[in-house]
Amino acid sequence: MALLLALSLLVLWTSPAPTLSGTNDAEDCCLSVTQKPIPGYIVRNFHYLLIKDGCRVPAVVFTTLRGRQLCAPPDQPWVERIIQRLQRTSAKMKRRSS
């Protein structure tokens, strides 16, 4: 199991992933999105880049624990699961600090 996890991480870090490009004056936009699921445990936070923001490709931009930004399609179930997990974690932390 550990070997499978190590191999999965190796493939993830060595394969090219869609990244941000500075083509929009207002904000950086994604040129494409990855269809390959990103492991949720490597994601620190996220934000949306949508057509209404001036981007041609709607995307959720995940920031990894190492600071890498990965573009993902907002309508995919795996993307929604990661966002829900991040929101639950954020809500728990806010309750603890209150």
Swiss-Prot record:
Expressed at high levels in the lymph nodes, thymus and appendix. Intermediate levels seen in colon and trachea, while low levels found in spleen, small intestine, lung, kidney and stomach. SMART domains: SCY. Pfam families: IL8 (PF00048). InterPro entries: Chemokine_b/g/d (IPR039809), Chemokine_CC_CS (IPR000827), Chemokine_CC_DCCL (IPR034133), Chemokine_IL8-like_dom (IPR001811), Interleukin_8-like_sf (IPR036048). It is found in: Secreted. Its main location: secreted. PROSITE patterns: SMALL_CYTOKINES_CC. Keywords: Chemotaxis, Cytokine, Disulfide bond, Inflammatory response, Secreted, Signal. GO terms for molecular function: CCR chemokine receptor binding; CCR10 chemokine receptor binding; CCR7 chemokine receptor binding; chemokine activity; chemokine receptor binding. GO terms for biological process: antimicrobial humoral immune response mediated by antimicrobial peptide; CCL19-activated CCR7 signaling pathway; cell communication; cell maturation; cellular response to prostaglandin E stimulus; cellular response to virus; chemokine-mediated signaling pathway; dendritic cell chemotaxis. May play a role not only in inflammatory and immunological responses but also in normal lymphocyte recirculation and homing. May play an important role in trafficking of T-cells in thymus, and T-cell and B-cell migration to secondary lymphoid organs. Binds to chemokine receptor CCR7. Recombinant CCL19 shows potent chemotactic activity for T-cells and B-cells but not for granulocytes and monocytes. Binds to atypical chemokine receptor ACKR4 and mediates the recruitment of beta-arrestin (ARRB1/2) to ACKR4. Belongs to the intercrine beta (chemokine CC) family. Interacts with TNFAIP6 (via Link domain). PANTHER family: C-C MOTIF CHEMOKINE 19 (PTHR12015:SF80), SMALL INDUCIBLE CYTOKINE A (PTHR12015). This is C-C motif chemokine 19. It comes from Homo sapiens.
